[in-house]
């Protein structure tokens, strides 16, 4: 009887820790995906950055062009205010597996030696993570 209780407790603990590992791995994917999207932006691939945003429906080409222009203006503003973004690293990432959402915490390192943490809300659709 005691052996059975110990076995149940051990199995429960094993299950608990295996779920945490899976959640951690999924959160890591959220962080890496957000970094990839922002690396596109950093390397002037504005189209890929814009395509990394979730939209339930297609958007008109004129609106897509406006989003691309906004991304270019953002990079221009960062160059003007901080001498540009020099590096993007992942600080942390969290995930809500029930709602298929997550947050990536990216650290921007600027040319003027300042840093800024940026939170990137993410959403998963059909196995792909997108920026919200």
Which ranges hold each PLM region?
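Sec-dependent bacterial lipoprotein signal peptides
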Residues: 1-19
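Short, compositionally biased low-complexity segments
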Residues: 5, 41-46
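Small side chains
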Residues: 12, 34, 102-104
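Short, low-complexity N-terminal intrinsically disordered segments enriched in polar/charged residues
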Residues: 18-43
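Short solvent-exposed beta->alpha transition segments
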Residues: 31-32, 46-99
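N-terminal non-globular leader segments, chiefly Sec-dependent signal peptides
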Residues: 39-42, 51-57, 102-107
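Exposed beta-sheet edge and beta->alpha loop/turn motif
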Residues: 87-132
